[in-house]
Design a protein with these regions (language model features):
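Conserved RNAP core-binding helix
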Residues: 5-12, 28, 36, 46-66, ...
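Sigma70-family region 2
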Residues: 16-17, 41-44, 55-73, 94-96
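A short, charge-rich alpha-helical start-of-domain segment used by transcription regulators
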Residues: 17-37
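Short amphipathic alpha helix immediately N-terminal
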Residues: 28, 135-162
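Structural recognition of an alpha-helix C-terminal capping motif at a helix-to-coil junction
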Residues: 51-58, 74-86
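Short, aromatic/basic-enriched loop-to-helix "N-cap" motif that marks the start
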Residues: 64-82, 100, 171, 176
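DNA-recognition helix of helix-turn-helix
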Residues: 89, 160-191
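Short, basic/polar amphipathic helix motif occurring as a linker/hinge flanking DNA-binding modules
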Residues: 91-113, 194-200
Length: 201
């Protein structure tokens, strides 16, 4: 069953109560995949992206518990991005040292703040959509093939023709499946978006 009771504000407050373990698990489950996706989009390998996400989330918890995050001075997304950007830059620096040792160029450019915000927003939308799709699979009688068609189109960016061929469907049926699944996901996505809203008061 979908849990939409924990806003980011409530989770942050929960980090201070009863050791904050339950709140931390939800916060980590919510933001770790976004940080991993961000790191992947910036060219890190799957393992490096997972390491960056791990290091980022550990740092977030430590800084928050040390009182170093002040919500009145900035959005949580900006704080998370700042930590993630530093961790990603560390990986690039290590790579640059190895490149220089081999006599190769060590120049690396990390996107500016607006580009990072845009990537973050895209990754957050994908995480929310995946969570909503998992909820739909668990709680509805939507055909598995329709859900698979939606996944292939949206997450794997396959063409309608490819999806139709892979799933033994007509192209028209693929379009209809995508439309049906998207319609069913709309309300769940809206609920989840409110939970992921870092800027809520």
């Amino acid at each position: 069953m979908l849990d939409v009771t924990h806003t980011t504000t409530a989770l942050l407050q929960g980090l201070h109560s009863d050791g904050g373990n339950a709140a931390w698990e939800v916060l980590d489950r919510r933001y770790r995949p976004i940080v991993t996706g961000l790191a992947r989009r910036l060219g890190l390998s799957e393992q490096d992206a997972m390491d960056v996400a791990q290091d980022t989330m550990v740092r977030v918890l430590a800084e928050y518990r040390d009182g170093r995050y002040d919500r009145s001075r900035g959005r949580m997304r900006s704080w998370l991005l700042s930590i993630a950007r530093t961790k990603i830059a560390d990986v690039y620096r290590k790579r640059a040292v190895r490149r220089e040792a081999r006599g190769e160029s060590a120049m690396v450019t990390i996107p500016n703040e607006q580009e990072l915000e845009d990537i973050w927003s895209t990754e957050r939308r994908l995480v929310v959509l995946r969570e909503a799709l998992a909820e739909l699979q668990a709680t509805s009688k939507t055909a598995d093939r329709s859900i698979r068609a939606f996944e292939m189109l949206i997450f794997h960016r396959r063409s309608v023709g490819d999806v139709a061929s892979a799933l033994d469907m007509s192209e028209n049926d693929v379009y209809l499946a995508k439309s049906r699944v998207a319609r069913k996901l709309r309300d769940t996505v809206k609920q989840l978006e409110s939970c992921y809203e870092e800027d809520a008061p």
